[in-house]
Amino acid sequence: MSMESDLQALLVAKCPRTFPDLAPTGTARPFVTWQGLGGEPLGFIDNTAADKRHTLMQISCYATTRLAVLQLIRDIETVMRASTAFIATPQGEAVSAYEMDTLLYGSIQRFEIYALR
C-alpha cells in the first residue's frame, strides 16, 4: 500500500469521516482532513532516489466542541506515532482554530512522515 492509503486507513480507524484535502459540505461532525505539504526529496550522491519518501503532512480535525477536537487530534497523534506502516513525528503541538462560518472548533497538527517509496 502507499503511504497515503496507509494514512487514510489509520485515520478512518479514529474517525470514519476522514477525507484528503477537504470534507464535503455538510459532513457530519467530527471529521478529519489530511493534506500533503511537500517534504524533502531523499536521494543518494549519484542522484538516484532513495527507497523512502519524506512528506510533511497536515492533519486537521473539526468538531462542535473544543474538548472533542482536542481529544481527537491527541488520539490521532498517538496512533500516528505507533504506526508500523511509516515513521511519523509531530512537528509541534496542535494549533487551535475556530471556523466562524461553520461554527466548528479545529485542531491542526503537522507531521513529518518517512515511508517506503
Name the predicted role of every residue range.
Residues M1-N47, L67, Q71-T78, S83:
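Small/polar-rich, solvent-exposed N-terminal microdomains that initiate assembly or binding
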Residues S2-S5, S60, T64, S83, ...:
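Generic serine detector
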Residues G43-I45, K52-T55, S96-A97:
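Short secondary-structure boundary micro-motifs
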